[in-house]
Amino acid sequence: MRTLSFNQPRQRSIGMAINNSKVLIGGVAAGVVMNLMDYLSNGVIFAERMRAESNAFKPGLGDMMSQMDGKSIAGLVIMDLVIGGLLVWTYAAMRPRFGPGAKTAIYVALVFWIFGSIIGSGYMQMGMISSGLWLSFGFFYLVALVLASIVGAWLYKEDSATS
């Protein structure tokens, strides 16, 4: 019978190593997809509605948010690239358990969407945006995450040396 002891050294399980170079390649591609989808949602599809609702919450807030400078845009681009990298890294980590392919990439996207939706719900709870806009953003964000995750997963491959 084996006892539980916190003093024993951990035995490392033998598994597949994550192919970091493919995570980087897939992550950049997924980040580019996220950037394009963010531009569509924030700059085109929901721009006027978001501006109006933000101005209703605090006069001038929506106008200020819509006039972003290069530093703000660069920060958002970097954030999307980081999200893309995390999507692909998570896909690589989940791949041995769920298998390669779009199904696992969609699972990854769902995990990120759930956390993102919980965090984003704060804007609705504070009254900054309506529940309708929050739901619209949430659906669009789910589509963006699924597309980005699938693109990143498509580019991610395990090296024969790491499997």
Show the residue positions of the predicted features:
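Juxtamembrane/disordered regions of integral membrane proteins
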Residues: 2-163
